[in-house]
UniProtKB/Swiss-Prot annotation:
Keywords: Repeat, Secreted, Signal. This is Cysteine-rich repeat secretory protein 4. The keyword Lyase does not apply. GO terms for cellular component: extracellular region. It comes from Arabidopsis thaliana.
Length: 305
């Protein structure tokens, strides 16, 4: 009897340990976020360990963590000059409050670990960004640093896609700057459109967002600068995302049908007095995929100050 009780006790301990390990792995997996880049401003002043600035920085980052469950944006300030620290976070408007909070929690911890003594730093994840600085940046447009992530797969209808994308971005900017009265998330708009062209049909999903501390004019400026960088970088990519300190853009194009076949060649004339006609070339040339390109591959473009 004692042996049976001991065996059951051992089995219970084993199952409890297994359950704990499983729940721990699940928690870690759910909290994973795609880190894109960290910028520690090497040109800013440094602070020393246990200094007033370090204390104020931790106060700001802790405040951002606490506020991350309340919305997609918040800012915080701590201390008096010359040790004033300002911070903010911005989450993508299309993610849940839980995902936003998890991302900000991770970002605020990592930025202090990676930028140990710099007075200004930025950290970009696919779902959020966090920054702090000794300089005031609220209500101002910052073009850099920024991070672009894009696919190495070509977009559909390659010959016409850059213009289609440019037109879509212009439309998004107009809608985003008028969204404070249209959306629960200020300066956020997402769109899905089915594009029908002779070469084939495709869906294009897109979104644009500005930090709520910007006014409509500065939001427009920020998004236009982001569009310019994205179009110069990757206007032939199937998807791309750019994240700047004050705004972000994303798009993804999904082909729905293949281009139609070329028109058939006319039959050769029956009269032997004429040579047979050569086959007509295709009206539209389909883009060739570069060696090594695939749908799952992507690349980051990073530009600092």
């Amino acid at each position: 009897m004692a042996t049976m009780i001991q065996s059951l006790s051992s089995l219970f301990c084993f199952l409890s340990l297994l359950s704990l390990l499983f729940s721990t792995n699940l928690t870690i997996s759910e909290s994973d976020h795609i880190h894109m880049s960290t910028f520690c401003n090497q040109f800013s002043d440094n602070f020393t360990q246990t200094s007033t600035y370090e204390t104020n920085r931790e106060t700001v980052l802790s405040s951002l963590r606490l506020r991350s469950s309340l919305g997609s944006y918040s800012n915080a300030t701590a201390g008096i000059s010359p040790d004033t620290v300002r911070g903010m976070f911005l989450c993508r408007g299309d993610i849940s409050e839980t995902s936003c909070s998890d991302c900000v929690q991770t970002a605020t911890l990592e930025i202090s670990r990676n930028c140990t003594y710099q007075k200004e730093a930025f950290i970009f994840y696919e779902e959020c960004m966090v920054r702090y600085s000794d300089s005031s940046f609220f209500s101002l447009v910052d073009e850099r640093p920024y991070i672009i992530r894009y696919s190495l797969s070509y977009a559909p209808n390659l010959d016409r896609f850059p213009q289609t994308l440019s037109d879509k971005m212009d439309e998004l900017i107009i809608n985003a700057t008028s969204s404070p009265s249209l959306s629960s998330t200020p300066y956020f708009v997402e769109d899905q459109e089915r594009v029908k062209q002779f070469e084939g049909s495709f869906d294009i999903d897109s979104m644009a967002q500005c930090s709520p501390d910007l006014d409509p004019r500065n939001c427009t400026t920020c998004l236009k600068l982001a569009v310019q960088e994205m179009l110069e970088c990757c206007n032939q990519s199937r998807w791309a995302q750019i994240f700047t300190p004050k705004c972000l853009l994303r798009y993804e194009a999904t082909a729905l049908s293949s281009p139609p076949p070329p028109y058939p060649s006319p039959p050769p004339p029956s009269s032997p007095l004429f040579s047979p006609l050569l086959p007509s070339p295709p009206l539209f040339k389909r883009p060739q995929t570069a060696s090594g390109f695939s749908g799952s591959s992507s690349i980051n473009v990073i530009k600092g100050n």
